[in-house]
Amino acid sequence: MKAKHIVKIEIKCQSADEMLKAKSAVLYHLETLNPEFQANENVLTVTVPTLDSKLFYPDEACKIIHDTLAQSLTFVHEWTCTLHNIN
């Protein structure tokens, strides 16, 4: 089954140490979803493919990911979690 959507997480970090801590938090919760990381200056961008299935619609998957990370990224000043269509 091919992913039709991705969840994109953008985390604005204030230091390299904070970026490492954020990456560790994301990996801890989402490692089985094969997240891809890209760092650009002070922003850590994470993309996670979502599979369309009868169990979770993509917008539900995005909300679950957001709610899960919200508990771990409390130390980060600003971050977003959005759903994108890749068709």
Sequence positions of predicted segments:
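Short, extreme N-terminal segment that most often corresponds to the first beta-strand
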Residues: 1-22
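A general secondary-structure signal for short beta-strands and their flanking turns/coil
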Residues: 2-6, 41-43, 76
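A structural detector for beta-sheet-dominated domains
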Residues: 10-14, 47-51, 84
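A short, charged, amphipathic alpha-helix used as a generic interaction element across diverse proteins
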Residues: 19-28, 65
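Mature extracytoplasmic or otherwise solvent-exposed domains
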Residues: 25-28, 36, 84
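Short, intrinsically disordered low-complexity segments
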Residues: 32-71
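Glycine-rich beta-strand-turn "strand-cap" elements at beta-sheet edges
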Residues: 75-87
